[in-house]
């Protein structure tokens, strides 16, 4: 079973995340930021991951630290749970519509961290969630997880729908990329390591 549990404590946050790549063993999200909880729940549900997130942060200052640090720990969990990545699909993509919005996420679990993010988020705040931090979260996940991520909103009007489609697309693309393929012999790289 490919799992990871990681706790990260700084002067600004304490984040504990448990991730199960192979079994949707339950989803429990508590960050203190309602919209962010909803997005992480959608990510795990549509990625079919078991995910527990307990995030305590300096929300009296700003939600940015909690959101970004949650991304860091989630990325670290993916990296740890994947181990040497033997037998995985590695590359995958997903398109997800939500009403008038369409998002795409493309991942390469390459061991090389990179983010291309293209989304026009016109509403600056959704509840206690600053929408500009969406990109920071995606960057934190990709860089801590050491994978390549291209995330974009192709079109849409409603900022909530755009962000939710992005989180769902990330979940679905990662679900497909981490899948074990019995036809893949060893590490899926000509280098022999990723």
Swiss-Prot record:
- The main location is cytoplasm
Instruction: Answer yes or no on keyword rRNA processing.
Output: no
The UniProt entry's GO biological process terms, in alphabetical order, are: L-histidine biosynthetic process
Keyword field: Amino-acid biosynthesis, Cytoplasm, Histidine biosynthesis, Lyase
Record-linked CDD domains: IGPD
- The EC designation for this entry is 4.2.1.19
**Which PROSITE patterns does the protein's record reference?**
IGP_DEHYDRATASE_1, IGP_DEHYDRATASE_2
Q: From the UniProt record, list the reaction(s) this protein catalyses.
A: D-erythro-1-(imidazol-4-yl)glycerol 3-phosphate = 3-(imidazol-4-yl)-2-oxopropyl phosphate + H2O
Protein's UniProt keywords contain Transit peptide: no
TM ranges are none
Q: Which GO terms describe its cellular component?
A: cytoplasm
Main enzyme class: lyase
Q: Where in the cell is it found?
A: Cytoplasm
Would you say which domain of life the source belongs to?
Bacteria
Q: Which GO terms describe its molecular function?
A: imidazoleglycerol-phosphate dehydratase activity
Instruction: Name its pathway.
Output: Amino-acid biosynthesis; L-histidine biosynthesis; L-histidine from 5-phospho-alpha-D-ribose 1-diphosphate: step 6/9
Kindly give the PANTHER family that the UniProt entry links to this protein. Answer: IMIDAZOLEGLYCEROL-PHOSPHATE DEHYDRATASE, IMIDAZOLEGLYCEROL-PHOSPHATE DEHYDRATASE HIS7
Family to which this protein belongs: Belongs to the imidazoleglycerol-phosphate dehydratase family.
Q: What is this protein called?
A: Imidazoleglycerol-phosphate dehydratase
Q: Which gene encodes it?
A: hisB
């Amino acid at each position: 079973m490919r799992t990871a549990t990681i706790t990260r404590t700084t002067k600004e946050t304490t984040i504990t995340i448990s991730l199960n790549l192979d079994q949707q063993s339950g989803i429990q999200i508590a960050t203190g930021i309602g919209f962010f909880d909803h997005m992480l729940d959608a990510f795990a549900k549509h990625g079919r991951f078991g995910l527990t997130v307990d995030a305590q942060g300096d929300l009296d200052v700003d939600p940015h630290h909690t959101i970004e640090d949650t991304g860091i720990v989630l990325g670290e969990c993916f990296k740890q749970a994947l181990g040497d990545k033997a037998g995985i699909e590695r590359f995958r993509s997903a398109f997800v519509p939500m009403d008038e919005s369409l998002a795409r996420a493309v991942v390469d679990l390459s061991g090389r961290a990179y983010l291309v993010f293209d989304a026009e988020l016109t509403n600056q705040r959704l509840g206690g969630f600053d929408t500009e931090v969406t990109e920071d979260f995606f960057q934190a996940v990709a860089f801590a997880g050491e994978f390549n991520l291209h995330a974009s909103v192709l079109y849409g009007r409603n900022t909530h729908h755009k962000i939710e489609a992005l989180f769902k697309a990330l979940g679905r693309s990662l679900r497909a990329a981490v899948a074990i393929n019995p036809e893949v012999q060893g590490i899926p790289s000509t280098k022999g390591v990723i």
